Regions:
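Membrane-interface coil-to-helix junctions
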Residues: 1-91, 119, 132
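Extracytoplasmic
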Residues: 91-94, 410-716, 721
């Protein structure tokens, strides 16, 4: 019931990832296994798409699809996936009982299952609707651990063999279900290293551990994710290295003389540590992703703004840890102390039977779990599992000690009558010794202990009223509160996504911050530029750059990308003052994420934000696309303590805004507001959870200059463009040869359709104008653009603005902008072409009839491709190393001359 509290707000999937997992499971059921394995999802990461099988949690989709076939019972898949995590959370509590029972006995197992059922970190990531990787991954991972430890403990070698194979199998499936399960690699590695010191049956270990490790690696490598990189990388080495050490240690101990065994063992241990560090430091092993490295080293968080921006990657604070684990930490600490105190006094005095190696494993997983949870908030559930194991064993030890019973024996009375050494008949009836059991510490102390324990367990579940273990796990499904900070339930997102599904063309592409990608794809049925898989940080940085760019620049970038709509989400509070509706912004929408946009895009936040790092500056409101998309205008600023108002921002003041639609649907701006969600259209006071959808105006005419497209002054005489069809006349015999470090690019001119443009290019080339310039704008799959004289010596912020000092008229034709065609770049006006040109490295029909095609690459296409693959700054599309994209010389040759003087192979061999 605790896990199902979110259903009070509405029966929906929760968070973001579950919507993709639902869509993927539906695809698997509808199209079958073969189609799923080869599924390239074109609705995500437009235009590249996504290989689902290699980038998602495959076992989650297969498990859900398999169980739905069996237990679906006529329910919809959507409803089934909502209940799925609650069911597996309950099943995992049973696995936890079995796991801890193996380590600490039945009492410890019962305590563990109880703690697991009410632990806030476990519940938060396993509530109803949480159809994500954690619940199933933790189930498989803990099941694998249980079978592994149970196999080591089993006296029957055949049963042990089966359990070890099962343990490796399910642990590997856990790895593939949720990457967080790989946390278990650390305690497993340390445990395997410790085993030869605490287990004497070395013959068993010699085959048991290698068997378990081999199965784990084989199954893990069989999945596309984690895949073979797991086996051959640092993570696989975390199992292979300790296994090699264990085998070596056993042989060293076996063949060493009694007096040298310890010395040799320590030498092997030290040498293994040095060798392991050397191997990992050499970078010969495949390194895990940044997230895994960040989990090991929390100081890396600030080095990646995208990782740092995700709430679940934040480092938990002391208050949060104390709220979650205070009582459990108390039991865990006391339990550890009692276990080691008893073992130091007398091996046989432990009140419960715990084998040496099980004690060691509990201690290792507890310490490592506490460390892991201190790095990532998302790993709190692993910390909770580790602390629960220690606390349960500790509480079992304490309880056994307190409630231990002492048996007293009462001797029979001997009759004084009769001969010596004999008893009377009556006394014979009492010769049997009487026994009486009492609590070792007395009845009162035992009852008091029970009361105290019950109180310690109950207090966190009822106090404080709004911050106890039960209340903190109750929150609305994210789709109903938009992921905001408010415990509200609105239909803003559902009705917006339904509107998108029914009112936009099916092939529409929607740009938004990546948080909303899965919702738009699944409930809106539309393609997005990025989503919650965060597969390409460069694309996410580019989206952030778009939001912070000028409206004209953002329009150009969106237009070039092929987007049709832009979505933005804003949260705030509406109130009425003197008959006017006013707003205070903040609460978890894009208005609260904008500072992360700036960090991810590499922008200086001081230009956009006031000194509180939240309140937008006038520049933000007037000069950024995001500021224009937010339908608000500053009215005043006030001090929340003194209620003093100011027309301008003062430190510590809060902004107050009025509603202003800056891009109305009937306007001629770069965007048109085509839909806004209900709470934005309400005139009642309260929380707003507003979703706005803007159409990108395809007919918009740029009004400002652009740094990526040349923007020379337009001649005072407006020249009307004409469209020319290619004639049967042969084009000029001249060709242009562009020399680069990768080889030559040979361009065949088309003066049959663009004679003035060809003549202009030849004139500039012959004068040396292009020599030393670079391809300053490189967009993979789109264009490489060059011809700006500013790239010879000007600063990067001037690249794309230079020209020849004059302009030429357009010469549109029916030629198509397909790969390797050469066309003239221009500014906002169609009459503004001058010197800059671009070579297509992909098809772009949206450019046809708008830009002048004047040539085609007939040789050196491989050189074009190499330049198109140069590493660029995602925020500007400029090459990181300009020399990679430099045109050393551009010459004009007749085709006959070129064929005799140009090298046979125009690409370089270097």
């Amino acid at each position: 019931m605790v896990r199902s509290q979110a259903a009070d707000y509405g029966f929906q999937l929760n968070e973001f990832d579950p919507f993709f997992n639902f869509r993927a499971t539906q695809y698997l059921l509808d199209h079958g296994v073969n189609a799923y394995v080869h599924w390239h999802d074109t609705m995500s990461w437009y235009p590249n798409g996504r290989d689902v099988y290699s980038t998602s949690q495959v076992p989650l989709h297969f498990t859900a699809a398999f169980l739905y076939k069996i237990f679906g019972a006529g329910s919809s898949l959507y409803d089934f996936t909502i209940i799925f995590p609650v069911v597996f959370g309950s099943l995992t509590a049973i696995i936890v009982f079995a796991l801890v029972r193996v380590m600490g006995g039945t009492t410890a197992g019962l305590f563990a299952s109880l703690f697991f059922a009410i632990s806030p970190p476990i519940i938060v990531r396993g509530t109803i609707g949480w159809f994500k990787s954690e619940p199933l991954g933790l189930f498989y991972g803990l099941l694998g651990l249980y079978l592994f430890l149970s196999g080591l403990k089993s006296q029957n070698r055949k049963i042990a063999f089966g359990k070890l194979i099962g343990g490796g199998l399910f642990l590997a499936i856990g790895f593939a279900s949720w990457g967080g399960v790989e946390f278990f690699l650390m305690p497993l590695a340390l445990f395997i290293i410790a085993l030869p010191f605490f287990r004497k049956d070395h013959k068993f270990l010699l085959w048991a551990i290698p068997l378990f490790v081999a199965v784990t690696l084989a199954v893990s490598g069989g999945f596309a994710r984690p895949g073979i990189s797991f086996v051959l990388g640092v993570r696989g080495f975390a199992l292979i290295g300790p296994t090699i050490f264990l085998v070596a240690m056993i042989f060293i101990q076996k063949f060493s003389r009694e007096g040298t065994a310890l010395r040799n063992s320590l030498a092997i241990l030290g040498g293994s540590i040095i060798a392991g560090v050397a191997i990992i430091s050499s970078n010969i092993l495949h390194a895990p992703s940044f997230r895994y490295l960040n989990a090991i080293n929390p100081f890396l968080t600030s080095q990646d703004a995208l990782v740092d921006s995700v709430a679940e990657h934040a480092t938990p604070n002391l208050t949060q840890n104390f709220t979650y684990f205070s009582t459990l930490m108390l039991f865990a600490g006391l339990g550890i102390w009692l276990i080691f105190r008893k073992r130091s006094e007398n091996q046989n005095s432990l009140p419960i039977g715990i084998k040496n190696e099980m004690t060691i494993f509990a201690l290792i997983i507890g310490i490592v779990g506490a460390y892991a949870g201190g790095t990532f908030a998302r790993l709190d559930l692993l910390t909770a599992t580790s602390v629960i194991i220690l606390a349960s064993i500790g509480l079992a030890v304490i309880t056994s000690e307190i409630l231990k019973k002492r048996t007293q024996v009462k001797s029979p009375e001997i009759s004084k009558k009769g001969t010596q050494g004999k008893t009377s008949d009556n006394s014979k009836k009492g010769t049997a010794q009487s026994k009486k059991s009492t609590y070792a510490l007395g009845m009162f102390a035992s009852i008091s202990y029970v009361v105290i324990i019950v109180a310690l367990l109950l207090v966190p579940t009822i106090y404080p009223v709004n911050g106890n273990w039960i209340s903190v796990t109750k929150s609305p499904p994210t789709i109903l509160n938009g992921g905001s900070n408010y415990a509200i339930s609105t239909n803003d997102w559902p009705v917006t996504l339904d509107w998108i599904k029914n009112n936009t063309p099916p092939n529409s592409v929607i740009a938004s911050w990546w948080d909303y990608g899965y919702w738009i794809q699944t409930l809106g049925g539309r393609t997005t530029l990025a989503d919650n898989a965060t597969l390409d940080t460069n694309i996410i940085a580019k989206i952030a750059k778009i939001f912070l760019s000028s409206p004209d620049e953002a329009w150009r970038m969106l237009h070039d990308w092929g987007a049709n709509y832009v979505l933005v989400y804003v949260v705030g509070q509406e109130f009425s003052s003197n008959g006017q509706q006013l707003y205070v912004l903040g609460g978890g929408g894009d208005e609260s994420k904008k500072q992360w946009f700036m960090r991810i895009a590499g922008e200086d936040s001081s230009k956009f934000l006031q000194d509180d790092q939240f309140t937008p500056t006038d520049y933000f409101w007037q000069n950024t696309l995001l500021g224009k998309m937010f339908p608000f205008t500053p009215v005043t600023y006030f001090d929340p303590n003194t209620h003093v108002q100011s027309a301008t921002y003062q430190s510590g003041y809060i902004g107050v805004y009025s509603k202003t639609i800056k891009y109305p649907v009937d306007g001629n701006g770069p965007l048109k507001l085509v839909y806004s969600s209900p709470s934005l259209n309400s005139n009642s006071s309260g929380i707003i959870s507003g979703v706005l959808l803007y159409q990108i105006n395809p007919n918009y005419v740029l009004q400002t200059s652009n740094t990526n497209i040349p923007t020379p002054q337009v001649n005072s005489t407006t020249i009307n463009p004409t469209t020319v069809n290619p004639t049967s006349v042969n084009p000029t015999s001249d060709v242009g040869v562009i020399s680069t470090k990768y080889g030559n690019i040979v361009i065949k001119f088309r003066d049959d359709v663009a004679p003035k443009t060809v003549a202009n290019f030849e004139k500039l080339a012959k004068s040396g104008f292009y020599d030393g310039t670079i391809f300053h704008r490189i967009i993979p799959g789109f264009v490489i653009q060059g011809g700006d004289p500013n790239t010879k010596s000007g600063s990067r912020d001037t690249w794309g603005t230079g020209d020849a000092g004059y302009t030429i008229p357009p010469e549109f034709s029916t030629l198509k902008h397909v790969k390797y065609m050469v066309s003239m770049a221009r500014g906002p006006s169609i009459n503004s072409a001058s010197s800059q040109f671009f070579i297509m490295i992909g098809d772009a029909p949206n450019l046809d009839g708008k830009y002048t095609i004047f040539g085609q690459v007939i040789s050196g296409q491989d050189v074009v491709d190499k330049i198109g693959a140069i590493k660029t700054d995602p925020a500007t599309d400029q090459p990181i190393d300009p020399e990679e994209a430099r045109m050393s010389k551009v010459i004009i040759q007749s085709q006959a001359t070129q064929s005799t003087t140009s090298p046979t192979n125009t690409s370089s061999t270097g």
